Amino acid sequence: MAIKSFKPYTPSRRFMTGLSSEDITAKPSVRSLLVKIPATAGRNHNGRITSRHKEAGAKKLYRIIDFKRKKFGIPGKVETIEYDPNRNCRIALISYSDGEKRYIIRPSGLNVGDVISSAESGLDIKPGNAMKLKSIPVGTIVHNIELKPGKGAQMARSAGGYAQLMGKEEKYVILRLPSGEMRQVLAECMATVGVVGNEDWANVTIGKAGRNRYRGIRPQTRGSAMNPVDHPHGGGEGKKNSGRHPVTPWGKPTKGAKTRRKKASDRLIISRRKGK
């Protein structure tokens, strides 16, 4: 997918880039697969901010995505490739032979007219086909990966995301994630063959603050620009440093300090990500 630039008729657009929409088919979305979800803007049910630097952003409807891929043995044809405002990859509308329509994450190389399917085993290794991990050959690139059988995909769902199946042992398979982490996943979990499309998303330059506001991202004030009452880094004369290791507004170490809590699934991680 090509990166496009813009004429600099304002300074903010000079370095702004975007993605071309040549792969998107000009058809309206399926209304039965659209649902309205109120924007929380980072607030909880009490109206208090629980996640800072968020706002509602541009109005949008949620597209119901099939993350489980449980229509075994029923082939589906790609009807359209669509833009999804809720994620950074494209989605594909699949029209199944029994008349049902569903959206899926579009893998790279999947085009209008292609036929895909889901099964426990026995399918061709081509982008868009979904099988259980135990039935996928070692070395295959996969995405849309379940962590618990039947729960739906939780890993490798964003633009350019993937994992590589490195080996199999008893009831687990070994996956290598893009971070370099080697992890065991239950062999009964479903995964889809291929890489998530729209890989060039990582090369897009936002260019101006307004585009982040459309996405629901608010400005982030530096702690050193605040007063001591507001942040541990605040205060001082001029641009004086805080004199301590970086911390959050609540005094917890940040910028490199490990904050992940230990949990039962840690035993499934064979090796941590690169450089850790």
Swiss-Prot record:
Pfam families: Ribosomal_L2, Ribosomal_L2_C. Residues 255-276 have a biased composition (Basic residues). Residues 230-240 have a biased composition (Basic and acidic residues). One of its GO terms (molecular function) is transferase activity. PROSITE patterns: RIBOSOMAL_L2 (PS00467). Keywords: Ribonucleoprotein, Ribosomal protein, RNA-binding, rRNA-binding. InterPro entries: NA-bd_OB-fold (IPR012340), Rib_uL2_dom2 (IPR014722), Ribosomal_uL2 (IPR002171), Ribosomal_uL2_bac/org-type (IPR005880), Ribosomal_uL2_C (IPR022669), Ribosomal_uL2_CS (IPR022671), Ribosomal_uL2_dom3 (IPR014726), Ribosomal_uL2_RNA-bd_dom (IPR022666). Residues 213-276 are annotated as: Disordered. One of its GO terms (biological process) is cytoplasmic translation. It comes from the Bacteria. The keyword Magnesium does not apply. GO terms for cellular component: large ribosomal subunit. Part of the 50S ribosomal subunit. Forms a bridge to the 30S subunit in the 70S ribosome. One of the primary rRNA binding proteins. Required for association of the 30S and 50S subunits to form the 70S ribosome, for tRNA binding and peptide bond formation. It has been suggested to have peptidyltransferase activity; this is somewhat controversial. Makes several contacts with the 16S rRNA in the 70S ribosome. Belongs to the universal ribosomal protein uL2 family. This is Large ribosomal subunit protein uL2. It comes from Campylobacter fetus subsp. fetus (strain 82-40). The gene is rplB.
